[in-house]
């Protein structure tokens, strides 16, 4: 049943996910579409990771971060999609209490880590364009590892705050989550305890990450733009712009979607609209699937490395 009664207390052992639709035919259609998207997401990001590892010309800080961004994108999509695909095939979509907490935490971890990685990549572009003579020392292997570890630690700390909040919530009976995965807001609505302090802490944690990473990105690109405008060479300007366009596109897609879902006032759109937007964010239509396409189509070094690897396979 998903609900256990112990004296005067009611314990929720599982949650019912209301999902996107109850229509059996539409469920099959959505299952097929989302499965295809998920397979493209995983294969595209794995290909990006493999290409960077085997191509010596891509062994630079920028692509070091890109390979980890691809890993995080797989994590973002995998934290939700497999369970969602299974539930499309079941008459009753459920997730265990523990599974819900894990899903919430993994989504927060990978989403937060992606924010930090995008900020680290912006800083890398800043150093490459604004301080080219100091780039090799300022972006040494040690510095890159420190930025990477810091990104994962930041993601872990933010995820920990959400996980601790979730397991502190009291659920007194209602266990129907009006979403297709365990997102924080629908779970808060089901809780019967006073969560005001926890909500403030979690909002502060998530808000701080957005503010800090956006500031790093904005400041980095402000200096980059100033430096580019001072360049006298048209070729130099074009090369600098081409270096940044892929990252700027990924940043715009990521923060634009996150802002629409989690920052805009809830009264400005319905829960159903929020669920549809979350599909774009979590499943891959907006971020995990697009990132490999963005970097492969807009980045000449990635395209050239791919051509070289394909040529080796053809003539080997």
UniProtKB/Swiss-Prot annotation:
Disulfide bridges in this chain: 100-192
Compartments in which it is found: Cell membrane
Extracellular side: 1-28, 79-102, 158-199, 262-274
Transmembrane segments: 29-49, 58-78, 103-123, 137-157, 200-220, 241-261, 275-297
Main localization (coarse): membrane
Single biological process term from Gene Ontology: G protein-coupled receptor signaling pathway
Glycosylation sites noted in the Swiss-Prot or TrEMBL record: 8
Bilayer topology: Multi-pass membrane protein
InterPro entries, per database record: GPCR_Rhodpsn, GPCR_Rhodpsn_7TM, Olfact_rcpt
GO MF assignments: G protein-coupled receptor activity; olfactory receptor activity
One matching Pfam family: 7tm_4
Keywords: Cell membrane, Disulfide bond, G-protein coupled receptor, Glycoprotein, Membrane, Olfaction, Receptor, Sensory transduction, Transducer, Transmembrane, Transmembrane helix
Cytoplasmic compartment spans: 50-57, 124-136, 221-240, 298-316
Entry's Gene Ontology cellular component terms: membrane; plasma membrane
Keyword flag Ribonucleoprotein: no
Similarity section: Belongs to the G-protein coupled receptor 1 family.
Function according to Swiss-Prot or TrEMBL: Potential odorant receptor.
Stated name of the protein: Olfactory receptor 5P79
């Amino acid at each position: 049943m998903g609900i256990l009664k112990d004296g005067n207390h009611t314990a929720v052992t599982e949650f019912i996910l209301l999902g996107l639709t109850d229509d059996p035919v539409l469920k099959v259609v959505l299952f097929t579409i989302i499965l295809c998207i998920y397979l493209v997401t995983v294969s595209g990001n794995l290909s990006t990771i493999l290409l960077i590892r085997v191509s010596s010309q891509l062994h630079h800080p920028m692509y070091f971060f890109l390979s980890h961004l691809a890993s995080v994108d797989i994590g973002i999509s995998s934290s939700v999609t497999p369970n969602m695909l299974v539930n499309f095939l079941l008459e009753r979509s459920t997730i265990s209490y523990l599974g819900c907490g894990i899903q919430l935490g993994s989504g927060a971890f990978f989403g937060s880590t992606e924010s930090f990685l995008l900020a680290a990549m912006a800083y890398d572009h800043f150093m490459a364009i604004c301080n080219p003579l100091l780039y090799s020392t300022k972006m040494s292997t040690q510095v890159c590892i420190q930025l990477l570890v810091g990104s994962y630690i930041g993601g872990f700390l933010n995820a920990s705050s959400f996980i601790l909040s979730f397991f502190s919530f009291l659920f007194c009976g209602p266990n129907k989550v009006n979403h297709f995965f365990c997102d924080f807001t629908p779970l808060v609505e089901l809780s019967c305890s006073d969560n005001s302090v926890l909500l403030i802490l979690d909002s502060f944690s998530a808000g701080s990450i957005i503010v800090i990473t956006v500031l790093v990105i904005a400041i980095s690109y402000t200096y980059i733009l100033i430096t580019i405008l001072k360049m006298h060479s048209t070729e130099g300007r074009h090369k600098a712009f081409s270096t940044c366009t892929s990252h700027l596109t990924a940043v715009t897609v990521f923060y634009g979607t996150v802002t629409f879902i989690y920052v805009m006032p809830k009264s400005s759109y319905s829960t159903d609209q929020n669920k549809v937007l979350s599909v774009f964010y979590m499943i891959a239509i907006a971020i995990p699937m697009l990132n490999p396409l963005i970097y492969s189509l807009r980045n000449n070094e990635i395209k050239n490395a791919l051509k070289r690897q394909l040529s080796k396979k053809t003539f080997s």
